[in-house]
Amino acid sequence: MISPRIMFTRRSAPYWATFLVIVLAALWLLWIGREPICTCGSVKLWHGETMSSESSQHIADWYTPSHVIHGLVFYAALWLVAPRLSFGWRLAIATLVESAWEIVENSDAIIERYRAVTISLDYYGDSVLNSVSDILAMVLGFVLAARLPVWASVAIVIGFEALTTWLIRDGLALNVLMLLWPLEAVRGWQAAL
């Protein structure tokens, strides 16, 4: 049997904190009324249809790369502003920020904002499964950024943005643009897909 003193060490504390943040985010999302899984009753590893009521309801979709990008960007930002913090604590902070975003993104105000200014007319918020998967995609991006050379991280960001812009006419940059400063020309271009 593993001793609790071995499992809960000073070195493992940030990873337990990261895990706890993810669990608390999932519980909060359930508490505010988010569906645990897609109301269609199934769980898919991949759902590639963006103009669908099942979008943002399954494990991965075309918006998953945006969350990987979050991880890459959070790693770079925390490396710059908190270089003395351990990798584990920087990961915990990044997970807290990503979890906070998932909670805000799934608030009624933001859901209505998406529906009002973007082409996401069928968007009713993420399932809890999708939100947790998005957080884990951010963790993946964070770990990749720690292991890869800077040029590779930059290439991933550019590649994912180019890929999603080309295939679904959306991505992290366009999503932020349309949420904060909606442009009718962009909305029309996205709707023409």
Curated annotation (Swiss-Prot):
InterPro entries: DUF2585 (IPR019691). The chain crosses the membrane at residues 13-33, 62-82, 148-168, 172-192. Belongs to the UPF0314 family. It is a multi-pass membrane protein. It is found in: Cell membrane. It comes from the Bacteria. It holds the Pfam family DUF2585. Its main location: membrane. This is UPF0314 protein Pden_1914. GO terms for cellular component: plasma membrane.
